[in-house]
Amino acid sequence: MVLPPPDRRHVCLTTLVIMGSMAVMDAYLVEQNQGPRKIGVCIIVLVGDVCFLLVLRYVAVWVGAEVRTAKRGYAMILWFLYIFVLEIKLYFIFQNYKAARRGAADPVARKALTLLLSVCVPGLFLLLVALDRMEYVRTFRKREDLRGRLFWVALDLLDLLDMQASLWEPPRSGLPLWAEGLTFFYCYMLLLVLPCVALSEVSMQGEHIAPQKMMLYPVLSLATVNVVAVLARAANMALFRDSRVSAIFVGKNVVALATKACTFLEYRRQVRDFPPPALSLELQPPPPQRNSVPPPPPPLHGPPGRPHMSSPTRDPLDT
């Protein structure tokens, strides 16, 4: 498959979000260390950023080239690479906060770190999907349905980031070490996998995308985010008396459970009541428009020098 020319605005915006968030994470890592250790950390993060930028230089261009197509393969690669590197840096920042090193007592810096992640991570996902660049999604209803499903993905990402932020925002932690590690790496795994599942559903549907048939991500997020997040927060409140539990996101997960249950029931009813050809009508491409201009009349050939006259019509003879 030959990709079209890359969208320069999309490439620049994606690179700006990725490298901007990486630069802020590097600033946190350097600021949390002091003395000769700071110089070593600065050298390490600079070398890592140069290597990451070399890889990003090619992957971001490929993502910008496929943004107007129905495929999102390079977008999944870029997302996996970004979250993999970002969460490694975030883990060391989290460990430095636990060790109460320099700058760890500043609550504003912790809140700013959470704000940075909550803007850049869901924002990059929506950039990689690039719904506004999908010119093959022509109907307004289908576009808004797809936008609503992508909004649920962004909410799940915010939910996972909130669970991670509850580990470093308070000055003291009430959870044991094993519970903190389990929470961090569970969210890390879901941040890697779940957006790639959503992007793969968009890519597998192709140009004749049907949002009502994209059921893999809702099932996975229902089990891994909505149910597990409610149980984990309830266990933290009941067992460890953790006051950092977000009641707002608990309510969000309860609403998501009810909404997705209704969606699954409606989908089963549609499959049962309508035959497969009726469901596949929406997948058919629109018929090509015919040219409304009538063809020109054929020329009348006659001897030169005489005007072209229409031959008189003859009445049929009655026999």
Swiss-Prot record:
Top-rank taxon, per record: Eukaryota
Transmembrane regions listed in the UniProt entry: 10-30, 43-63, 74-94, 112-132, 150-170, 174-194, 214-234
Biased segments, Pro residues type: 277-306
Pfam families in UniProt: CECR6_TMEM121 (PF14997)
Cellular compartment(s): Membrane
Chief place where the protein resides: membrane
GO terms under cellular component: membrane
Keyword Transferase (UniProt): no
Cysteine disulfide partners in this protein: none
Membrane disposition: Multi-pass membrane protein
Its job: May play a role in MAPK signaling.
The family this protein is said to belong to: Belongs to the TMEM121 family.
Protein name stated in the entry: Transmembrane protein 121
Organism: Homo sapiens (Human)
Lineage, top ranks: Eukaryota, Metazoa, Chordata, Craniata, Vertebrata
Gene designation: TMEM121
